[in-house]
Every structure is written in structure tokens, then in C-alpha cells.
Amino acid sequence: MESFENKIAVVTGGGTGMGRELVLQLAKANCNVSMCDVIEENMDQTMDLATSINPNVKITKHVCDVSIKDQVEKFRDDVLSEQQSDSINLLFNNAGIGGGQSFIKSDIEEWEKVFAVCWYGVYFCSRAFMDALIKSDEGHLINTSSVNGFWASLGDGVPHTSYSAAKFAVKGFSEALLNDFKVNAPHLNVSLVMPGHIGTDISQNTGIILGKRPEDLDENELQLMKE
């Protein structure tokens, strides 16, 4: 995609960190953006920053837990309505949380929630927005995995199973889509991003979704949030 000008991008996890930076860079490139997050106040800050960079693009915000299919489908419907379009050009599956370190010792509900956000969030959003991507003249799906998507460890003595398993799934899904798009939707592209450890505010969203405050997280959990 040579230019983002007048395109429509969807960014999950747009309230903070890499998601916020994506929104700002897209706005700077004259791209209209719809973002979701679980914390509306963070999206308000992102919107203020984006509109100060470029007041001429359309930025919309939507509260959505990407691990819940019904919320994702409502997010899609609201995006298309507010952007007044039946298509989008870019989908950035960026949202994620940490936690659920041990398959043996971690709380089952927490383990499954982390996996759901980090994997099913990518799947549900890709599924929900696929028709809108296909309807575009040129579309691109960008999935965020992690260095832990090919190395499932933070080091000796630190279990990292739920997050790593989900990020491996994102990597495999993205690689499989390369051929699927080539055969069935050649005007679409897919990219995989595998960042290392980044100082984002993932702990805040993790706490909201898992019902924990940052100060309630143990030392290992805090280490996971720094990615």
C-alpha cells in the first residue's frame, strides 16, 4: 500500500502503547482511523492527540473487549456506520493482555481469558472485518504476535504458557493466510509483527480485564506486562 491517504484503518487496543502510536502515525498520514479499547478514557487521550496532529481525518472510538464475539461484531457495525463505508483498508490486530503464566498453577479462568484476548481477539476481529477488507480495492491485515510467538519463554523459572501459546497461534494463522489470500483474495495482504519487550501500559488493560489492580500483580506478572 503506497499511501494511507483517505484510507480507513481499524486499530484494536488503540488507547495506549503501540496501538496509540499506530493511531497517531496513521492520522499523520491522512488516514481515517477507528479504534477500540476497554478503557474509554485512554481512547479519549489518543483522540485528542490524533486530532491535534491532523484535524482533517475522521477518528472514532469504541469500547470493546475483543475476546467477546458479540462486542466485536457490534464494533464492526459501528465502525462501518460512523465511517460511512462498507469497506476498510487496514486492520491492525494489536490488542493484548498478559498473565496466565502457568498451565499447572494459574487460575483457569485467568489463563483462558489471556488466551482469548491474545488469540481469539485476533480471530474474532479478522473474521468480523474480513468482508469489509475484501470489499476494499486494496486491503492489509496486520497481526501483532510477539517474540514469544517463536520463543515461549521469558527465561528459566518463569512460566509463560497462555500468552506464548496465543502468540504462536497468531503467528501460524498469519502465515496460513498468506496462501489463502493469494488464492482467494489476491488484492489483500497480511503482515506479522513480532516485537520484543516494550514498555507499554498493558498492565492497565490486563488489570481491567482480569479484575486486578496493577499493585495486585505479582513480580512475574509485572514482568509479563512489560511486553
Model region roles, listed by residue range:
Residues 2-33:
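Canonical Rossmann dinucleotide-binding motif of NAD(H)/NADP(H)-dependent dehydrogenases/reductases
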Residues 102-103, 110-112:
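Substrate-binding pocket helix/loop in short-chain dehydrogenase/reductase
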Residues 146:
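Residue(s) in the substrate-gating loop at a strand-loop-helix junction
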Residues 31-45:
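Conserved glycine-rich Rossmann-like NAD(P)H-binding loop of the short-chain dehydrogenase/reductase
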Residues 126-127:
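A short, exposed helix-loop element centered on a Lys and neighboring polar residues
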Residues 40-41, 63-74, 108:
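The beta1-alpha1 cofactor-binding region of Rossmann-like NAD(H)/NADP(H)-dependent oxidoreductases
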Residues 183-227:
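SDR active-site lid
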